[in-house]
Every structure is written in C-alpha cells, then in structure tokens.
C-alpha cells in the first residue's frame, strides 16, 4: 500500500510539472502572437466582421 501511495504521489508530481511547462509554453506562444502585427490584424478582423454582419442583417431584416 505504501508503494502505491508513493507511485501515485510521483505521478501527481510529474503531471503537475508537465502542466506547468505546458502553460508556460502556451503563454509564450500567446505573447509571440500578440507581438506579430499580422496576427493582430487577423484578430481585429475576426472581431469586426461578425459585428458588421449583425448590423447589416438587422438593417436588411427591417
């Protein structure tokens, strides 16, 4: 029973480290994308186009 607790604790510890490393890598990727002007333009377009579509559909529907 003691060995199973040790192995579970080891798995938990390794999983926590792995999760931490993945989060750091993801944060670094997000910062890199924010720094790229082309990516920023794409994000603005993604936010802008649905808004324009809703406005136009509202005007056409009335």
From Swiss-Prot:
Which segments does the entry list as coiled coil?
none
InterPro entries tied to this protein: Frog_antimicrobial_propeptide (IPR004275)
Residues recorded with modification Isoleucine amide = 60
Under Pfam families, the record lists: FSAP_sig_propep
Extent of the signal sequence: 1-22
What's the main place this protein lives? Answer: secreted
At the top level, the lineage of the source is Eukaryota
List the subcellular locations.
Secreted
Annotated tissue distribution: Expressed by the skin glands.
Q: Supply the alphabetized keyword list.
A: Amidation, Amphibian defense peptide, Antibiotic, Antimicrobial, Cleavage on pair of basic residues, Secreted, Signal
Residue positions assigned to the propeptide: 23-45
Cite a single GO BP annotation. Answer: defense response to bacterium
State any GO CC term: extracellular region
Q: Say which family it is in.
A: Belongs to the frog skin active peptide (FSAP) family. Temporin subfamily.
Job of this protein: Antimicrobial activity against the Gram-positive bacterium S.aureus.
| Name of the protein described by the UniProt record | Temporin-1PLa
Protein species of origin: Lithobates palustris
């Amino acid at each position: 029973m003691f060995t199973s607790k040790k192995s579970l604790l080891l798995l938990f510890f390794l999983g926590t480290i792995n999760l931490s490393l993945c989060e750091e890598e993801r944060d670094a990727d997000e910062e890199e994308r924010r720094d790229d002007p082309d990516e920023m333009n794409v994000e603005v377009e993604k936010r802008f186009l649905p808004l324009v579509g809703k406005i136009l559909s509202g005007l056409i529907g009335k």
